């Protein structure tokens, strides 16, 4: 057990009671010197691993030139260079424009402002199992009450939730379409809805992929009703699914796009990108932030984009990762491990569901596996509505033998349930 400062709020939940000291690619070491294979990576922040040398070099070089300047006071070059790079990197028919933020949650908040200002509407439709942040407006979008919304009273809204259709959940496109239509008949007129926000692959919800048929219906539905479609790629973006962004798998494009996590290789940064016309009439000063677009974080992000811009390399990373996970999953099935449910997700964004033969989620078993795996030198992260799905978030750059070693540890823990 680690000893934490008593000045740290107990409202911060900690999955692994250890204190980390340093990391390299897919490994971390705690202050006692114990080494771990890292299948968490800051919860999807390190798609290219801990301390990638190119990223570290970019950070050092920029820190020696300028550590910070508030962009609203006087622009700095890394911000501008990064916005150009993002516009080229994001695969949309027309380049998106936008702003940099400190985090994904802040990107969500600013997207809501843009949507409400442009549509002159206030309602938002989100999805069961969604996670969009812990700030006040963002957390009301989350498709789960505990622990995010408990005891907070009325939250900014109105927000309405419908089922998330996915081959991973068993919820069909038709079921979600019917729920959406019912919403318009019973709860709120669609002419009052500013935006629909959705993750192409749910993160905290359990790495569940949005049904492609529904995604295309949703794009048409939003166009028909003057509703803005916000795609949250905070966790699924920057190569995690084998493409630059997960929306490429779905055959749609967003009106607004939320970015964060792996955008800057561990530096705090997010972005809210959108179609250019959405900013034309917004008041000067309505967007911004003191630390938003910090130059050191921008320098790191520029290097990340360079490293992820080669499509064949990116696809190979994700395919190799996916194939190894599938091979181990098939072995677990062949061994008759009854607690092992579905393999969720796509590319290198994969989840292992734990479920009993009678249908009960394996919440207690997952908690047990987290502890057992850590003792054996593997860090894992829970997800899912019942905390019954193991998130596999190793770096795309993980060595093959390290990935196999980690999956063998996981298999041993599954066999002990």
Where are these regions (language model features)?
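Conserved N-terminal phosphate-binding loop of PLP-dependent enzymes in the Aspartate aminotransferase
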Residues: 1-417
């Amino acid at each position: 057990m680690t000893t934490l400062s008593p000045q740290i709020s107990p409202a911060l939940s900690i999955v692994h009671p250890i204190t980390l000291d340093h990391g390299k690619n897919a490994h971390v070491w705690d202050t006692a010197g114990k080494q771990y294979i890292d299948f968490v990576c800051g919860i999807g922040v390190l798609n290219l691993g801990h301390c990638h040398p190119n990223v570290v070099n970019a950070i050092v070089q920029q820190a020696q030139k300028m550590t910070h300047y508030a962009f609203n006071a006087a622009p700095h070059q890394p911000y501008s260079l990064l916005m150009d790079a993002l516009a080229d990197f994001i695969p949309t028919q027309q380049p998106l424009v936008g702003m940099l933020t400190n985090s994904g949650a802040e990107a969500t908040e600013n997207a809501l402002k843009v949507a409400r200002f442009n549509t002159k509407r206030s309602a938002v439709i989100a999805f069961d199992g969604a996670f969009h942040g812990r700030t006040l407006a963002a957390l009301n979008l989350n498709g789960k009450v505990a622990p995010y919304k408990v005891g907070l009273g009325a939250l900014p809204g109105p927000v309405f939730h419908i089922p998330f259709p996915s081959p991973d959940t068993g919820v069909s496109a038709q079921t979600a379409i019917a729920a959406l239509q019912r919403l318009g008949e019973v709860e709120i007129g669609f002419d009052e809805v500013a935006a629909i926000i959705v993750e192409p692959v749910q993160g905290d919800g359990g790495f569940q992929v949005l049904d492609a048929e529904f995604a295309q219906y949703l794009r048409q539905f939003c166009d028909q009703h003057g509703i803005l479609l916000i795609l949250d790629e905070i966790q699924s973006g920057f190569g995690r699914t084998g493409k630059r962004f997960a929306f490429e798998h779905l055959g749609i494009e967003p009106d607004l796009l939320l970015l964060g996590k792996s955008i800057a290789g561990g530096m705090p940064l997010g972005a809210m990108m959108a179609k250019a016309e959405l900013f034309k009439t917004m008041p000067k000063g309505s967007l911004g932030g003191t630390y938003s677009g910090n130059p050191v974080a921008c320098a790191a992000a520029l290097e990340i984009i360079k490293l992820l811009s080669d499509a064949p390399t990116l696809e190979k990373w994700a395919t190799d990762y996916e194939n190894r996970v599938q091979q181990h999953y098939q072995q677990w099935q062949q061994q008759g491990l009854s607690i092992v449910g579905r393999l969720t997700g796509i590319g290198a964004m994969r989840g292992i569901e734990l479920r009993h033969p009678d249908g009960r989620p394996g919440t207690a078993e997952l908690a047990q596996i987290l502890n057992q795996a850590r003792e054996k030198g593997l860090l894992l992260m829970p997800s899912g509505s019942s905390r019954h799905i193991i998130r596999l978030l190793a770096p795309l750059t993980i060595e093959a033998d390290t990935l196999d070693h980690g999956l063998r540890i996981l298999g041993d823990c599954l066999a002990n349930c």
